[in-house]
């Protein structure tokens, strides 16, 4: 089984730049903001997700938003991982040990399962409105690679 890295993600971003709209390291959240978000959520972000935030901030793959960390909810609620997850938990759409990172227009929800957090990582699952959660990726890099390939029409 392949272990995905940030280099794998970077190669796919270069290859499929026409369907990807990510930020850059220059506009990425700093360590203080990331720590504040983690404290507010009561979860430590995975190493792969933190690396993504520091290198790409967040953005979209096709029309699918990848949630990020924003400064003090500056009127940007749609893609803010803290705001979205606190509301999801409050409204019964997620459990405290699930960190939702993306929702598609088709009702798919992708989230980290923190009940399996080990060595700085935990797997991602997805679920549709009508079904049970299904394993999706071993880390955030694999998640990104699979989502990019799916949007590009390449088999994951």
Residue spans for each PLM region:
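Compositionally biased, low-structure terminal segments
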Residues: 46, 68, 126-127, 141-144
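A surface-exposed partner-binding patch
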Residues: 1-110, 155-156
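Short, surface-exposed linear patches
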Residues: 67, 89-90, 121-125, 132-134, ...
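Ampiphathic alpha-helical segments that act as solvent-exposed interaction surfaces
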Residues: 99, 132-155
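Segments surrounding the PLD/"HKD" phosphodiesterase catalytic module and close analogs
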Residues: 109-137
